């Protein structure tokens, strides 16, 4: 009998459930927005793990390559709001270099630098470049919009937003309402599906 081998997507999902996810029957977790939720997702507990880095790099790189093929144009760089997007952007940059098609990384500050050039963005800088905004988890969309604003200040052309987890709490709809495309590797429902399966 053949045993099913976990795909990279399965492997990363299991790491997220194990290290980054808590859930409750009642909304007991307070989010950054002040709202209460049944779910607590701290993606950084997974994205900073050595075991997760190759999986993150591969999964996001594959999504970006699919987008490039669709548009017929290359993506120059990936990045998002520090700190959540940073390890994902670095993983993508490293993976892309290994495959001979480098995609650069950048990091968007939460506030512009208070001295010197007062920059919003560190790392890759090329006005007009096509970039993908990376997000670890999308809830209301507020932090993603802040990252987009910083990237626009740097002169980037935003192609799409690519998130690790969509909490399915209105963030996707808010970004779309503002005219931004978004896709996610996982949703909260994907994480809960693993939890339910483990409980069987």
Predicted regions and their residues:
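Active-site-facing substrate-recognition patch
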Residues: 1-70
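PRPP-dependent phosphoribosyltransferase catalytic core
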Residues: 2-18, 149-200
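Active-site catalytic pocket residues across diverse enzymes, especially alpha/beta-hydrolases
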Residues: 68, 96, 155
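Short glycine-rich phosphate-binding loop at a beta-alpha junction
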Residues: 71-84, 160-162
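Structural detector of well-ordered beta-strand residues that form the stable sheet scaffold
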Residues: 78-79, 106, 159, 183
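Active-site nucleophile and cofactor-binding loops and adjacent substrate-binding regions
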Residues: 80-84, 109, 138-139
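Short, glycine/charge-rich flexible loops or terminal/linker lids adjacent to PRPP-binding catalytic cores
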Residues: 89-132, 142-145, 198-199
């Amino acid at each position: 009998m053949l045993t099913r081998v976990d795909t990279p997507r399965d492997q990363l999902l299991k790491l997220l459930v194990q290290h980054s996810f808590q859930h409750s029957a009642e909304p007991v977790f307070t989010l950054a927005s002040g709202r209460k939720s049944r779910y607590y997702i701290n993606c950084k507990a997974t994205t900073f793990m050595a075991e997760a880095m190759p999986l993150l790099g591969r999964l996001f790189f594959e999504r970006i390559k699919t987008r490039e093929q669709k548009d017929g144009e290359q993506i120059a760089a990936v990045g998002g709001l520090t700190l959540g997007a940073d390890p994902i952007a670095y993983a993508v940059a490293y993976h892309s270099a290994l495959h001979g098609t480098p995609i650069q990384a950048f990091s968007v500050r939460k506030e512009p630098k208070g001295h010197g050039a007062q920059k919003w963005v560190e790392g890759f800088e090329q006005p007009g470049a096509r970039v993908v905004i990376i997000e670890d988890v999308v809830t209301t969309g507020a932090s993603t919009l802040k990252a987009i604003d910083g990237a626009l200040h740097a002169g980037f052309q935003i192609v799409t937003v690519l998130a690790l987890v969509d909490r399915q709490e209105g963030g996707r709809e808010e970004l779309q309402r503002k005219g931004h495309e978004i896709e996610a590797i996982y949703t909260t429902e994907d994480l809960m599906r693993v939890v339910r399966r483990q409980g069987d």
